[in-house]
């Protein structure tokens, strides 16, 4: 049962104490806060439920640091918003100014509300006709919530801090700052924090660039500050999805791990910081440019949610994010009366034809798509204005008469043809961008973000950024998209964003506009989806340049990378799934050699890699032999058998000792069955490859492990040096307990590098 309790006591030094304990038993998660006197709260526990919650009141005496020589009279024990007034000597985490002068605030708590908020929906899942089925439960969602009101009366700044323990076990905190005085209050940065244990001594983040997103990097969590920030209007490739700390060597299946994420699609920072005097903190927030957000008397600014996830290993950390995102989307469907549906198999035309659109080619491609089992046909860039290449036309969201003339070979005719084949129709847009060589820019040069009236920011891909904070520009973009969605019967929008947003100043106000621009993007997403119930939108940003809980709450999927080379995708997919559930990660079967790397790979490898995401095709099937089309159809048919379970499954990754291999899986919620993928990226040091562990199963159950029933002919994939048959690679498989599979595992087949095989695990 969901629990929140408040306790009162007195510290050994006479300080009055208040403690709040919150628990979500079903999620095996809890947190505890202690308020020393009227100070802001400290996290004193974040992890598994406690057996004696009333003892959290004692944590002040148990954990508060002593005063030490050569320092202040009080040794810092960081609150949720560390400031110098509480002896924090680290980086500035609360940057506000009045009349250009920085304020050093000391907040005094005036009210603490700790309650279970009964709001939102809860769901029950049952199996119907072999697939998961959801229904809305009668009881509302129960969320333990702490709301703290605090104020610096002299400085005329009020703080309202809210913390929730979600049913998934995620902890969400945000702060609202209100100007209670005269004169404009400028907001620079409000970086909230979670305290972490002393043995959380290693940091894991991701970095990357175009075509190589979310590459993991580790380092010791030493004294000092480590930060990953993005100041180009989106999270971008180098920003980290999560900042995770844990016991040295933590992995997907082991180690206490504490992760933080800023749920925001604009400028932000995630950081880990440790001082010589006190415990470490992780946290983050939005970063604002000078003059960007200013509050007049009575006005407020609210930070994005800072979200924390605890787990025994990264798999559990990720599962909490997946559960949260899935519920948000389930709520949207229920609230708007939209029936849920399986993730349709997509064909996107980009790597098939690029800008070379014509009716005959794309209708023929649609025919091949139908043969391959495709259910959604998406026309990519090149259908509008003067958009014959990437140097012109962006912003002119009218159908090009040069490419799609009115008549029986128009874009409307193509949409009708696609719909007539039983497919959904999708179309590419890049609403936030404009080419200087466009009618929109020529007619409205003031509709772009730029630092001065006479100078544009540096171009990227021959593009500038539309000022969506300008109501006229917003109305034009929204109106053009709304009109086309209605006229063409568009079921799906691929929304792209291909320029780093720099020198982001609105001509309308003369002030930086990153914050307002991000809110405008959220608004146009929700406006379009509300106006066209059932419309789905994919978030793409030069591939995976904008992936965060902000955009994930309103987009229906993300494009993980412009690189569909399956060798590169193996880790891109793996680390994207730390935040994003598989059914929301666009994974496409591309050509061989891959367009982005020129690496040749087998069709089996490409299909097996795409199998664990929102499966699609980005490949000119008109040039492929019928044998390949038939094989593709077999794989899409197999994917359709499992995709509804993938959308509720627990995603697991194994910590393979061999750096040359990857083991990934999707386990049913009741652990009755699972599908795993073994990928041999390069040659292994051992020959054959060592046994691999299969995490996530019921340790006490017996399972049958066998190959998945698709074209995984080892005779075509083996190394060919006379190896013997693999004992369990038969239709009958082998029976083992879940504990055995997780402890010492199973021997994978000997296959060439850049190959992958799938196998199923079924409880008997």
Regions found by a protein language model. Name each.
Residues 107-109, 120, 293-312, 754-760:
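Short Pro-Gly-centered flexible turn/kink motifs
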